[in-house]
């Protein structure tokens, strides 16, 4: 950055490289402060200085990180053609994200507002199609897989873990039942409050993002179950019920569903995604739909990879950052809600024929719950939830409770009665069992950074004295 003008490169290119350098520098320090708090701040050390450097206060490091992102926003353009490079909006968007993480509400609002004022980004018209698209006006910073290079990003480094066993997948990375239950009903109420929720037909009357994120399936209690079954006999199933097909097959995790519809032949074939035939089918009966594309069927040809765009920052997050920060400052207005969370909800309900549940101004605590639930629904499987749990100080609760899985079909359970989602009833139905997942509150990957001793090994004694968990630093 100091010597760019002496290289003979055009000023516009020098400015681009400066912007990208500031972007990476600011982003890296934001990540460090999010996970470690205080950290070494290097603004140009000599080697001797680096040997004795100590951690700088988190607020000092964060201020420098935001300064770098501001400089990046000054140098970077609004957009590029045909290239995946950081832009002005990405710099501002990440500044908003990390300001929110550190509860710097005003900075988060200001950075998000600048993103919104750029006029460059907008919500993708269709929520489900966005995650199958090769580009989107909503993507502010993303990675694109490449099947020629056999490279995927995010969990698409190994899609076999997410696809059905019928085509050779493992299907062992399931959406949690807690995520499933967190989606509201179409009246905007959670399932334990809404009269619309039917535990025996759990996808009915739910936020449309549920069936766009988790693969839906029919139960014999569904209102149109007779028509559903008839369509498989008369060959109209793919046309009438496309949402219940994944990768060429009907999905039905019920232990009583011995066969499923195969699109290519129009015939019923053995169901290998049910506990009736495979003990390792989806452990809780749920599989991912978000991101899944038909060409995932060929995952073995591409070293298990997929070429989806994996959004690391979406415009929807900027909108949700804005409204959350405004609410935390006690300044959230109806206009704020309408241009953020309500805009996102309207998109989710578009083309469904159902009016979206408009969020209206109410108490700060009530809005806080709504905003947090919507973040979970909107950004599932996009790498955001973990940091949200940390900054909301609820990870010790969410990670220290039961998880629910289906028993094998031959476990002497009498019925598979659907999903009730009741926190007070540990056995969600007779076929659900619980596995306790423990979480030590002190075991967050935040805080301790070991010094290095004369042998080049981490010196853990000061960390242990300070109360940090150091297990993950020790060699086995």
What function would you assign to each model-found segment?
Residues 62, 105, 332-334:
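TPR-repeat structural position
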Residues 1-36, 50-52, 56-60, 69-83, ...:
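Conserved, well-structured interaction surfaces
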Residues 208, 212-344:
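C-terminal substrate/ligand-recognition segments
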Residues 88-263, 399-416, 423-424, 429, ...:
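An aromatic- and glycine-enriched ligand-binding surface/loop that stacks and positions planar moieties
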